[in-house]
Amino acid sequence: MSSPPEGKLETKAGHPPAVKAGGMRIVQKHPHTGDGKEERDKDDQEWESTSPPKPTVFISGVIARGDKDFPPAAAQVAHQKPHASMDKHVSPRTQHIQQPRK
């Protein structure tokens, strides 16, 4: 098989044509050019800003103060499951499997 000349590459839709071996296409990963990366860096610097201010939360008409109103310990207690005062005793069921006689 002949390879295309190094100086001039044919492009289809802006990229070189697919390489086939045994009737199947072979994926070729090529690194991107550095031109687009420089443009992205400029855009990132322009749009860098701090996070937007947090909106004030009103609970029953009063401004909430975050952890001061609801400490983390109180939230943990609210999410814990209540424990049973007495243990449940499950009676074991015997499984009877019907099998044919010999």
Curated annotation (Swiss-Prot):
Biased amino acid composition, Basic and acidic residues: 32-43
Biased composition (Polar residues): 92-102
Modified residues (N-acetylserine): 2
Keywords per UniProt: Acetylation, Apoptosis, Autophagy, Phosphoprotein, Translation regulation
InterPro entries: DAP1/DAPL1
N6-acetyllysine found at: 29
PTM annotation (Phosphoserine): residues: 3, 49, 51, 91
Post-translational modification: Phosphorylated. Phosphorylation by MTOR inhibits the suppressive activity of DAP toward autophagy.
Chain residue ranges for the region called Disordered: 1-102
PANTHER family found in the cross-reference section: DEATH-ASSOCIATED PROTEIN 1
Its job: Ribosome-binding protein involved in ribosome hibernation, a process during which ribosomes are stabilized in an inactive state and preserved from proteasomal degradation. Acts via its association with eiF5a (EIF5A and EIF5A2) at the polypeptide exit tunnel of the ribosome, preventing mRNA translation. Involved in ribosome hibernation in the mature oocyte by preventing mRNA translation, leading to ribosome inactivation. Ribosomes, which are produced in large quantities during oogenesis, are stored and translationally repressed in the oocyte and early embryo.
Subunit structure, interactors included: Associates with ribosomes; inhibiting translation. Interacts with eiF5a (EIF5A and EIF5A2); inhibiting translation.
Protein family (similarity comment): Belongs to the DAP-DAPL1 family.
Descriptive protein name: Death-associated protein 1
Source species: Mus musculus
